[in-house]
């Protein structure tokens, strides 16, 4: 799913350093499984899990991870994706005492730590994802606090997206008509390319 893109260079670097790499790709459905070919090229084994069973095996990422833990000696785990998924992977790996790195995707506004939107608690201390992370020891992250903070604007986001959608479609339709309006075509024909690019914008 969403964590595959940032995970790919990590997998490639681990493999290049001579590690045995087992990758568990997971998503809600087949359409959300991306970069499979690239992951296979840099992994010794790839397990694919989908929530609906439309591709690979039906189940959650934690099921695939636990299967690997039970049959292999796992020295390190990396988890990148939705916060809830990272939380449960970390709970699982903590049980087996496997160090786990996560890459957090909290709300970030200014990228300097000034706004505090990305504030989290790691090992009982306040950290800012934008300046202290985004990678952290997953066993130290207070995921419950993080999930609560990330959900603070969900209702407002849903309301705004609902308002925005019809407007976007209308704007797109209007833009298409406006872009190819007869008066614009006449103007384009009457001007040489250099004259068109010289118009102050």
What is each residue range found by the language model?
Residues 1-110:
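FNR/FR-type flavoprotein reductase catalytic core
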Residues 15-21, 28, 35-45, 65-68, ...:
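Iron-sulfur (Fe-S) cluster-binding modules
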Residues 4-6, 83-84, 105-135, 163-172:
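Local cysteine-cluster metal-coordination motifs and their immediate loop/turn environment
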Residues 90, 113, 141-142:
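Short acidic, glycine/serine/threonine-rich loops at helix termini
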Residues 53-57, 77-80, 108-111, 131-134, ...:
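Short C-terminal domain-edge/linker segments immediately following a structured domain
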Residues 57, 100, 126, 132, ...:
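Glycine-rich, flexible loop/turn motifs
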């Amino acid at each position: 799913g969403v964590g595959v893109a940032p995970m790919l260079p990590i997998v490639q670097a681990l493999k290049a350093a001579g590690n045995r790499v087992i990758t568990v790709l997971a998503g809600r459905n087949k359409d959300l499984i991306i970069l499979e070919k690239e992951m296979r090229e840099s992994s010794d084994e790839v397990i694919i899990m989908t929530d609906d069973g439309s591709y690979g095996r039906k189940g959650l990422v934690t099921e695939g991870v636990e299967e690997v833990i039970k049959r292999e000696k796992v020295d390190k785990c990396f988890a990148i994706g939705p916060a809830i998924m990272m939380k449960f992977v970390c709970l699982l790996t903590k049980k087996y005492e496997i160090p786990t790195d996560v890459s957090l995707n909290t709300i970030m506004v200014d990228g300097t730590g000034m706004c505090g939107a990305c504030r989290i608690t790691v090992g009982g201390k306040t950290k800012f994802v934008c300046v202290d992370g985004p990678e952290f020891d997953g066993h130290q992250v207070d995921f419950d606090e993080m999930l609560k903070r990330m959900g603070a604007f969900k209702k407002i986001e849903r309301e705004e997206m609902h308002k925005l959608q019809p407007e976007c479609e209308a704007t797109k339709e209007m833009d298409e008509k406006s872009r190819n309006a007869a008066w614009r075509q006449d103007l384009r024909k009457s001007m040489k390319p250099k004259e068109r690019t010289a118009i102050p914008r």
